[in-house]
Amino acid sequence: MKHESRLGKKITIALIVVLALGAIYWFGLRTDPKVAALNQAIHEKASPALRDYHYPFRVLRLDDTVAVMATPRSPAMPVYRMIGALYPSLAGKAPDNPDFVAAEKELAKVQSEAKDIVLEQPGVTEVKWELDENWLISHGISLN
């Protein structure tokens, strides 16, 4: 009888663990299907320039009808501070350098294209940008 009791207790604990892990996945780790669809649209409709760009523009979340997208630049992270991560040959170049200017224009062009693709999707009325701090840190760029 004691053996059956221990076995039942182990099964109960195992079921609780499985349910807890399932809840963590369902409520915290899985990607929102709408966000996944928006990112799939970017992937499918992107020009070769956007598809092959050094930074993966993507939707992070959907707040009602507002798509929040990741970006490597913002007023807090101007282009001159992060351009070297995208184009290592431009690290330390002056912002008026012709190659720097061309790279800045290319960044703006592909970012705008990603935004336009997302805005074309049903249920999205606006795009807001959020600085991709994890990407910047992973590329050795200080946030302060």
Question: Where do the PLM segments sit?
Answer:
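Hydrophobic membrane-insertion alpha-helices, especially the h-region
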Residues: 9-28
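Conserved aromatic-histidine-acidic binding/catalytic patches
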Residues: 30, 34, 102
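Extracytoplasmic/periplasmic/luminal assembly and interaction segments
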Residues: 44-117
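Short, Lys/Arg-rich N-terminal segment immediately upstream of the first membrane anchor
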Residues: 1-8
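Alpha-helical transmembrane signal-anchor/signal-peptide segments
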Residues: 33-47
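Short, low-complexity, Pro/Ser/Thr/Gly-rich segments in the mature regions of secreted, periplasmic
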Residues: 132-144
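Short acidic amphipathic segments
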Residues: 56, 114-133
